[in-house]
Amino acid sequence: MSIEEIPQGADVNVIPKNEKKARELIKKLNLKQIKGISRVTFKQRGNLIYAIDSPDVYRSAAGTYVVFGEAKVDDMNQRIAEAQAQQAQQEALQKAAADAGKTEDKSPEAITADLEKASLGDKKAEDEEEDEGEIDETGLDPKDIEIVVEQTQVSRAKAVKALRNHDGDMVNAIMDLS
């Protein structure tokens, strides 16, 4: 039978010439074939695995095994990386679906709460504007004020206020503003 005579998609096992010779020699050694084994794996250092699906396994009287089949290299590090990437992608999809599922609440209570939050934000802005007026820096070292402003990225007035609240202690003033 030639290759042209085999129908497309047929399940045919083609045994190489060397493997055929090895099988004939195995039969002469009186090895017993073991049935029911669906997969054989050989593990090597570095999480490298050689896997043989649907192998032909023979056992000698001494307890050694001879395995025939097509070996496929299976890199566990690559598998783990792929699994982690797939898991991260699934989590991102779930998060996106959860975010898309959230709809804004347009009940009167929610609108009132939003307005109150906005008005509190306006009060904070007014406080900041009041701080920008005349600043009384008496009793404070100008270098301390500059250090607090640099470290916390706040206005000079807020830095002076924090230093006054902490009796000129720069560390506590910076921690308070951070």
Swiss-Prot record:
Task: Provide the protein name.
Answer: Nascent polypeptide-associated complex subunit alpha
Which keywords belong to this entry? Answer: Cytoplasm, Nucleus, Protein transport, Transport
Could you tell me which species this protein originates from? Answer: Candida albicans (strain SC5314 / ATCC MYA-2876)
SMART domains on file: NAC
Q: Name one GO biological process term.
A: protein targeting to membrane
Q: How does it assemble?
A: Part of the nascent polypeptide-associated complex (NAC), consisting of EGD2 and EGD1. NAC associates with ribosomes via EGD1.
Q: Could you tell me which residue ranges the NAC-A/B domain spans? A: 16-80
Family under the similarity heading: Belongs to the NAC-alpha family.
Compositionally biased, Basic and acidic residues: which spans?
A: 101-126
Q: Where is this region: Disordered?
A: 82-145
Pfam families per record: NAC, UBA_HYPK
List the biased-composition ranges (Low complexity).
82-100
PROSITE patterns given for it?
NAC_AB
Q: Where in the cell is it found?
A: Cytoplasm; Nucleus
- Which part of the chain is the UBA domain? 140-178
Q: Its function?
A: Component of the nascent polypeptide-associated complex (NAC), a dynamic component of the ribosomal exit tunnel, protecting the emerging polypeptides from interaction with other cytoplasmic proteins to ensure appropriate nascent protein targeting. The NAC complex also promotes mitochondrial protein import by enhancing productive ribosome interactions with the outer mitochondrial membrane and blocks the inappropriate interaction of ribosomes translating non-secretory nascent polypeptides with translocation sites in the membrane of the endoplasmic reticulum.
One cellular component (GO) term of this entry = nascent polypeptide-associated complex
**GO MF annotation terms:** phosphatidic acid binding; phosphatidylinositol-3,5-bisphosphate binding; phosphatidylinositol-3-phosphate binding; phosphatidylinositol-4-phosphate binding; unfolded protein binding
Q: What is its main location?
A: cytoplasm
Q: Where is the composition biased (Acidic residues)?
A: 127-139
Keyword check for Lipid biosynthesis, yes or no.
Answer: no
